[in-house]
């Protein structure tokens, strides 16, 4: 399958959805938010699915949905935890160019604010710093390209992301 999608990964607050919408408009592509696809498929909000299935159970649902995406000419914004699903990540790498929107920890904290309101779920005893340090190697492992978003304007990030095609 030809890689004509752009898949955005990164921490919550990195700007995946914001960059995704603007990038899709620039390229004339569809925009897909995989969190919304999950909610639509299961008929529940993400936090309801997490309450019902637990964090790891939610990761399984997320993996299954992302592994079955079949979009073409789309910008796909994923949930921050998509990288825990190896099946999903291998599939996304096959159907698109995976772009990691990288931010320093301090900027993630600044952008996120209230973790619960943003749907960021931490394991018992885990801090946001722990989560950040756990995920960074996974984002880097799966990314075809890394865009350092620190102190960059939206248009600069979109321009860099469009150049991956």
Language model: regions and residue ranges:
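NTP-dependent small-molecule kinase module
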Residues: 1-3, 22, 26, 136-165
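Hydrophobic anchor at the beta1->P-loop junction of P-loop NTPases
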Residues: 8
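P-loop (Walker A) phosphate-binding loop of NTP-binding proteins
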Residues: 11
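ATP-binding Walker
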Residues: 14
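Walker A/P-loop
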Residues: 17
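Post-Walker A helix-loop "phosphate-sensing" segment adjacent to the P-loop in P-loop NTPases
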Residues: 25-36, 44
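ATP-dependent small-molecule kinase phosphotransfer cores
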Residues: 36-82, 86-91
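A glycine- and Lys/Arg-enriched "phosphate-lid" helix/loop adjacent to the NTP-binding pocket
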Residues: 94-137
């Amino acid at each position: 399958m030809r890689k004509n999608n752009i898949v955005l990964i990164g921490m919550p607050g990195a700007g995946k959805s914001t960059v995704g919408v603007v990038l899709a408009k620039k390229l004339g592509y569809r925009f897909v938010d995989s969190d919304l696809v999950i909610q639509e498929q299961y008929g529940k909000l993400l936090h309801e699915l997490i309450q019902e299935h637990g964090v790891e159970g939610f990761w399984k649902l997320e993996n299954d949905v992302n592994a079955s995406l079949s979009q073409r000419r789309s910008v796909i914004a994923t949930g921050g935890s998509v990288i825990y699903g190896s099946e999903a990540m291998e599939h996304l790498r096959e159907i698109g160019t995976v772009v990691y929107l990288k931010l320093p920890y301090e900027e993630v904290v600044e952008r996120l604010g209230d973790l619960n309101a943003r749907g960021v779920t931490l394991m018992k005893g885990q801090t946001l710093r722990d989560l950040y340090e756990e995920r960074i190697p996974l984002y880097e492992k799966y990314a075809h390209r890394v865009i350092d978003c620190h102190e960059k304007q939206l248009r600069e990030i979109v321009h860099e992301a469009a150049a991956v095609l």
